[in-house]
Amino acid sequence: VLVLAKICVRYQYLLPVNVKFIFQPAEENGQGTQIMLDAGVMENPHVDQFLMFHYVNDAPMGMELHRGASTAAIGSVQIEIKGKAAHWSSSERGIDSIYAAAKIIEAAHELNQTYQSKWPFIVGIGMIQGGKAKNVVAEDTVLQGTLRSCDLKDYQNLRELFLKKISEIETETNTVIQVEIDEEPIPPIINDDSMVDLGLKVGDEIWGEDSRLVTQLYLSGDSAAYYFRYAKGLFLVFTAEKKG
């Protein structure tokens, strides 16, 4: 992208439009896009069309793009479980927060197996921290994870089902559970149809058969999806597999 920016600057007198390059900060925590939008990145000059580039090295040389959604809606999951500490020699006096955590993890796996959808989705717990000593019933346990879906309706359905199951586990285990699952997730990136058509045309001219319109959806996501609310956009993936 830096090379492309250099070329555009060098030959800007040949370009019939203004070209603005955006290098996004804070990508991993999902905050970068809003920072840029608040700073007026889509104005001065006003942005009418938006291209987003991504590079991967696990597919043959070429270009891939989707029609419609190309990434997933992504929400964070934070679960705090409060039990009651007790020595394991008198465990009946305690309330085991790790046991409740285990049931929540099992519920997430069950939801992944039983929820029916034509779109990819996942409910995943990636972090667990609980207990203070090996001989003490764990009073506090914290779970962190992610909820991802390529369909916003599925996202909301999965969120409600998971919250309902966690509430049942709270009653069953006599714990107190606080749950935060983003009600408004980072949205999926939705490619503009006219931009897809243009991308395919240019891709055919440059890449030929190595320009691919793909249908497989991935559960990756990016807060750059918010840019697509301000201008017609296209998310392009350039592939450059290194063989050997």
Q: Model-flagged regions — what are they?
A:
Residues 2-4, 8-127, 131-138, 222-224:
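Histidine/acidic-residue-rich, glycine-tolerant segments that coordinate divalent metal ions
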Residues 99-244:
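Metal-dependent amide/peptide-bond hydrolase catalytic core
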